[in-house]
Amino acid sequence: PWSKYLTGAQGTAPKNGFDPLAYWVERAHALGLELHAWVNPFRITKGGAAEFQALTADHPAKLHPDWVVEYEGDYYFNPGLPEVREYIVRGAEELARKYDIDGIHLDDYFYPGSGFADGAAYAKYGKGFSNIGDWRRDNVNQLVKTLGERIHAIDPGLSYGISPSGVWADKSSLPQGSNTTGGYESYYASYADSRKWVKEGWIDYICPQIYWYIGHKSMDYATVARWWADTVKGTGVSLYIGMADYLAGNSDPKSPWYGTTAIERQLALNDTLPQVAGEAHFRYRLMAENPELLALYAEAYGEESQEPAEPAYLNTREHDAYIQGNDGRFRPEDSLSRAEAVAMLARLTV
């Protein structure tokens, strides 16, 4: 059913058949931007029992109450059920088929915590696992792997990535972990084995949320960024660093996030790591409302970042010479970019 955040009432469709995602895709492409659909796979509500009860009767959580687990007042789909994982994968497939999106991105929420009440599912499906933690990680791994395979079967050009919490595991917990201590280890806290996703090549890119400053005593930004750079090395998986723009601009001169100094130092460090392909900034509104950050990014990314890139979807009447040297025959040694392929198809239909 339709989200309440679109029309104010869950299950109520926008007027006149308006499809907001189709509109966003159209406008993004017109500006030369890619649009990646952001998916939060297992979370149903964050507003407690009242929000859950307000869900419409045709919501999957109401149609399949056996899929639902309550945890600390909020409600989640149970990752340990094969039918839940299949439902999420089919949702991603619908996005890939129905919309001209450029990618699908999974958020960092998988299991909400170790006290998740999934004992019955573990008893039914956990045979072959020595502990519930390994079984939970395998459930998430199955979703990550299968979802990528299925959307790439529909559109091999889709970019598929995930933004896990910045620390996979401390070295004191796992020998392959980072030299960090005492923080949130996603391997254990949300059962997200993000290192495995990279090493197995199940995703196209990883975007760890490294929301700490350089010099943090237990989770130093530089330490974590270098760990991720080393992790992706040689895998073919791209690395984009999730930046904490929302913390920048603190008015307290004693704060490590005072002004834009912390972000500036992080960008400089990223530039020294060849594996870092770029940054993702959380979040746009806070960045747009911070003139100092905007000025910093204009300098860091170049003035061209202030202007829309040329659209990948070309008006072929204005780009008659775009495909150079093509005589209508395609040879084994030839190759086409996505934009060229779209342009050629457009020529066949006008």
Regions found by a protein language model. Give the residues of each.
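Aromatic-lined substrate-binding rim segments of carbohydrate-active enzymes
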Residues: P1-N40, K124-I154, D220
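Aromatic- and acidic-residue-enriched segments that line the glycan-binding/catalytic groove
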Residues: P1-T12, R43-E72, Y109-G128, S173-G183
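The substrate-binding groove and active-site-proximal loops of carbohydrate-active enzymes
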Residues: S3-G17, Y71-E86, G128-V140, G182-G183, ...
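Active-site-adjacent "subsite" loops/lids of carbohydrate-active enzymes
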Residues: V25-E26, H36-K98, Y188-A192
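Aromatic-lined carbohydrate-recognition surfaces of secreted/lumenal glycan-active proteins
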Residues: E34-K46, H105-D108, D134-Y187, V237-A248
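Substrate-binding cleft/loops of secretory-pathway carbohydrate-active enzymes
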Residues: G47, I154, S159-C207, W212-W227, ...
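Substrate-binding cleft of secreted/luminal carbohydrate-active enzymes
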Residues: Y191-K217, W228-Y313
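Extracytoplasmic Gram-positive cell-surface binding/anchoring modules and repeats
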Residues: L314-T349
